[in-house]
Swiss-Prot record:
This is Calmodulin-binding receptor kinase CaMRLK. Disruption phenotype: Endosperm development arrested at one-cell zygotic stage. Increased resistance to auxin (e.g. IAA and NPA) and osmotic stress (e.g. mannitol). Calmodulin (CaM)-independent autophosphorylation. Residues 319-337 are annotated as: Calmodulin binding. It comes from the Eukaryota. Residues 319-666 are cytoplasmic.
Amino acid sequence: MFLKLFLLLSLVSFSHSDSSSTVSCPNGTDFHQLTTVFRYVSGFNSSWFSSNCSAVITHVVLPSRKLNGTVSWNPIRNLTRLRVLDLSNNSLDGSLPTWLWSMPGLVSVNLSRNRFGGSIRVIPVNGSVLSAVKELNLSFNRFKHAVNFTGFTNLTTLDLSHNSLGVLPLGLGSLSGLRHLDISRCKINGSVKPISGLKSLDYLDLSENSMNGSFPVDFPNLNHLQFLNLSANRFSGSVGFDKYRKFGKSAFLHGGDFVFNDSKIPYHHRIHRLPHRHPPPVRQRNVKTHRTNHTPLVIGLSSSLGALIIVIFAAAIILIRRRMKSARTKSRWAISNPTPLDFKMEKSGPFEFGTESGSSWVADIKEPTAAPVVMASKPLMNLTFKDLIVATSHFGTESVISDGTCGPLYRAVLPGDLHVAIKVLERIRDVDQNDAVTAFEALTRLKHPNLLTLSGYCIAGKEKLILYEFMANGDLHRWLHELPAGETNVEDWSADTWESHVGDSSPEKTNWLIRHRIAIGVARGLAYLHHVGTTHGHLVATNILLTETLEPRISDFGINNIARTGDDTNKNNVEFDVYSFGVILFELLTGKQGSDENVKSVRRLVKERRGEEALDSRLRLAAGESVNEMVESLRIGYFCTAETPVKRPTMQQVLGLLKDIRTVSR
């Protein structure tokens, strides 16, 4: 028993520390990288891992933890010692980066029973064109078509069952060391012959596809196989008694046009072609009765009663299973609440909280219940600062979404299953409380489809906290620069069309119409702010949140006006907002971050009438005739980023120009 417990604990490569404390590790540590990976995933709790900042993570094993959301894969690159990755049986979505398979130490990956999609192939990393992965389980997901296993030379176990591959994955025939292969229920059409050279297989499941081929000549060496399932396919061929006895009748059931040609096989098991789905009609015999005989009647009634009981029992079982399945489905697709940490609540303040950057902020109040949370969107909610502490696990690192220049941003689930983002405004600590309340109340009244309106606020001592609706799709910066191409959050799998055949990108990112719509939305929201006499002052891609339909919503507007300092004098005006929008437009069109260097480079290309060279290659490949629209949009960005502020257009003019681009092209 002790040995089993030890093996179970060893799945995580380092021991858990005391979860009663919240530790903030430097950015370069494995622990920090891991919390960043799951920052947009509901239900993740960093206390599952050691908070020892010097610990090295080799195993990430989190099966059946009710995780829900999109994994931010990029930080996993920095877990250089990672060997085992198991996120099975959760509700994670998106696609997998192609560089994942080239991580040198990664040998076992289990991502089964999630909602992952996209392509699977090895992309060279640091000169390596091969994958070290030996065991790979991607069953019960959403993978389609773009699958290539040419570089997976070390694979011994591969399970791709219950996906929608459509065709046999490329490169399977070259996996000489493969011992276990399961591609059942993958909607595969075509011949089985490409895998006939797999000589090491001892397990092969091809069931419930539409594959064809001649048995046994088109199949791998059957002498080494211990398990075989060819049922529900379109195969043909001759099955001898040795194969029948070894694999059983079920291996060939509905498998195609098989001939069982050995007299030792029972006659009723010799299936020559696909069996009928319904039994043949039973001929009724004429029965002559010369005298009354109650025995047949009793037997008939008994049989009928027995059959009725069996039918009722079977119906009850089916009903129970359907209800259980429905309950499991609802549980799986529901957004799970972050698991609260066991922490000790100080009886009296001040309360100090660490951040990812290593700094800290202090709520200098004696009682956490003394600071109310004012919810403009739900005025009847009775919340206090204590509720925010509990909802964020003591403002722990596992609840951090980001830690930017304005202050840390946390994810929380308040009573009533209200998902919110909480930002600590470090820059306005010294602003008078009454002035802050006046400003917050004014901001809660600004409502527009492209603004992320302030939901509420809390003032705890000098600390000012604001609450927004939580946006699970994250921000524009993350969507453009951090997420792997091919990501999809499409709920209807049967109609999932996000796969792309242009490189490794999805139509979400290669679609100019979507990026143009985002630009229009941001311009519309900013124009509204200027119309009501408010400026943003710090418009960047991380302050533009995306809804489930990729509709943009601007956040943090008006905050710079509260924290007016000498350094911000030139930023609290509409001209600076217009410049910032031009940078955003450049990011949307080039796919590059809006650094000063990139802005200068794009402006130079536009000025030299070489704007097409600056466009994101993913857009150019997929756009076709829309290239002219994108080049014209670059010119709008050029006007917005004019060095002389007075030469910049107004946001209302910018909005009109962006709308005209699509109107003229049509």
